[in-house]
Structures are given as structure tokens and as C-alpha cells.
Amino acid sequence: LLWTFIDIAGRSDKMLAKFEKRAYAGSERVWVGKYRNLHNIAHWHMEHELIACAEGSAKVMLDDTTYRLAPNQCVFCQSGSVHSIEADPDSLLYVCLFNENICASVTQVYQPVTPLFLDRYGVLQTLSDLRHELSDRQLFFETKADAMITELVISVFRGEPLTAAVHQTSEVTTRYKQLLNRMDAEYDSLTFQNA
């Protein structure tokens, strides 16, 4: 897995990311990381993201709202949404990114009423199993990973209250992305006041 962070100057050597783009080693479309004390900055990417708390707690900022994530709680971030994670000391989080096309028939039509939910669906166990599947790379592992995340997303969406998917970003999110794009284009001459 290759992570590319594009900073406000357009270089890929800093962590001031506005947009994350990753290239996978093979044809897999799912990735799972396990992190202790994770901190990242506000960013977005074209994959959906599922964050699950195994230990401790974390603040997850998602678009215009901050959620407190406790053990056995999860947050679902729709593709394209601006989000960040600030974990407390000794926290353990699983973070799963998956291609938005895998579950498009579900996630393009519906979204949970609230992105924060209790893990009544085996999210933590499934993400752990997915990590092993992706690391072992047995025959057909890509298809198996797609199937595992699809089954998990369907379970969550069947069990949580749903609403129609909103594909229009909030004004704050749109302005934030526009500001970062402007900073990209005018990095050398843009002043804090003008921004």
C-alpha cells in the first residue's frame, strides 16, 4: 500500500494533507490499519472509511461535527467527506478504507442517520479478519475482502436507522476544500488575511 499525502504546496513530502490517494500493491480494493494513539489531520479521499475503537477513546471530526468514539463504537465516513482522528493515549483503533464502488448499491442510496454507532455487527472482529486476509494474500483474497466488507456494510445498514444518501457537501466543507485548492494554486503569494 502506498500512501500519498498531497500538502498545501502540492509536494508529497509533508503531512499537511488535504487529499489522500493510495495505490495498492495488487488489485485489492480494501485496506485495514490497526493504530495505537492515532492522530491525523483533516483530509478526505475517495474511499469510504470505517473507524472502530477497540480500546480507549478518540475524537473523530466528520464534516461539521465531532464525535467521541468509545470502545465498541464505530464511525462510518462516506467517500469524499472531510474527517480527522485525534485518539487519546493508549487507544487502539481499526481503520478500514474501501473502494466506494464495492457497496455502491447500498451506500449511494442510503446512509446511516448518524455515522456513530455501537458495534453490534462484529465490526472489530471483521476488520481483524480482513487484516489477516489481506496480509496472507491467499488465492482470491481480493474477492474475499470485497465480500467481507460488503457483508459487513449490509449488516450495519440493515441494523442502523437510515436516511437517503446526501451527496451534496455542506457549505463549510465546500469552502474548506476551495480554500485548500486556492492555497495549492497560490502558495507563494497567498497571505493569511487573503485566505
Label each residue range with its predicted role.
Residues L69-V82:
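Conserved metal-binding segment of the jelly-roll/cupin
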Residues Q111-D119, L134-K144, I154-N194:
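Short, Lys/Arg-enriched, Trp-marked, Pro/Gly-tolerant hinge/linker segments that flank
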Residues G80-I102:
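Ligand-binding loop in jelly-roll beta-barrel domains
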Residues L1-R68:
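Generic protein-terminus/edge-of-domain signal
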Residues G122-T126, M148, S155:
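Amphipathic, well-ordered alpha-helical segments in soluble domains
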Residues F98-V113:
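Conserved segment of winged-helix/HTH DNA-binding domains
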Residues M61-T65, S79, D88:
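Short strand-coil-strand connectors
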